[in-house]
């Protein structure tokens, strides 16, 4: 049993994805991370706020960005329906959350249970977390989960 567990952990380690550098899309909203203000700004323009939680050099973040946020019809749909901001799960920038508490990016990720990247939170207008998507999803599945 121990040999089988060791063999499976070695096999899993052999297929671990390699780090992959990426840039966040230039159309993502530049913000002071005042989430209540960002939610209100989006709502005023008939959009929702989408928060993209990422990790530097995360290959699955790179894939999700490339397939959905960088080019093509998915980007156009997302950009027309959402203001998108990015939060680094290991970042130290201050984030004013919807309850008025200021967290670092990494503290907020922990508070919200973001245990894998990429993760996407869709904010409702009240403001509240309306929807949470954890991990990489293929483009069609991702768009379905966003309701697009």
What do these predicted regions represent?
Residues 45-49, 80-85, 115-118, 125-129:
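Loop/turn elements at helix/coil->beta-strand transitions in domains of secreted/extracellular proteins
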Residues 1-5:
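Bacterial N-terminal signal peptides
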Residues 87-115:
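Structural alpha/beta surface segment adjacent to cysteine/selenocysteine redox centers
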Residues 44-59:
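Short active-site neighborhood of thiol/selenol oxidoreductases, capturing the structured segment around
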Residues 8-12:
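Sec/Tat signal peptide C-region and signal peptidase I cleavage site
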Residues 61-79:
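Typically the conserved alpha-helix immediately C-terminal to a functionally engaged Cys/Sec
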Residues 13-45:
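N-terminal leader/targeting and pre-domain segments
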């Amino acid at each position: 049993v121990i040999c089988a567990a060791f063999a499976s952990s070695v096999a899993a380690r052999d297929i671990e994805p390699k780090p992959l550098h990426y840039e966040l899309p230039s159309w993502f909203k530049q913000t002071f991370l005042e989430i209540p203000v960002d939610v209100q700004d989006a709502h005023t323009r008939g959009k929702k706020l989408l928060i993209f939680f990422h990790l530097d050099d995360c290959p699955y973040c790179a894939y999700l960005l490339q397939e959905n946020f960088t080019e093509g019809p998915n980007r156009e749909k997302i950009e027309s329906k959402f203001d998108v901001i990015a939060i680094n799960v290991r970042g130290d920038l201050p984030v004013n959350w919807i309850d008025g508490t200021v967290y670092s990016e990494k503290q907020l990720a922990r508070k919200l249970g973001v245990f894998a990247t990429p993760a996407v939170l869709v904010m409702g207008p009240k403001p509240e977390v309306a929807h949470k998507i954890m991990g990489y999803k293929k483009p069609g599945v991702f768009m379905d989960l966003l309701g697009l």
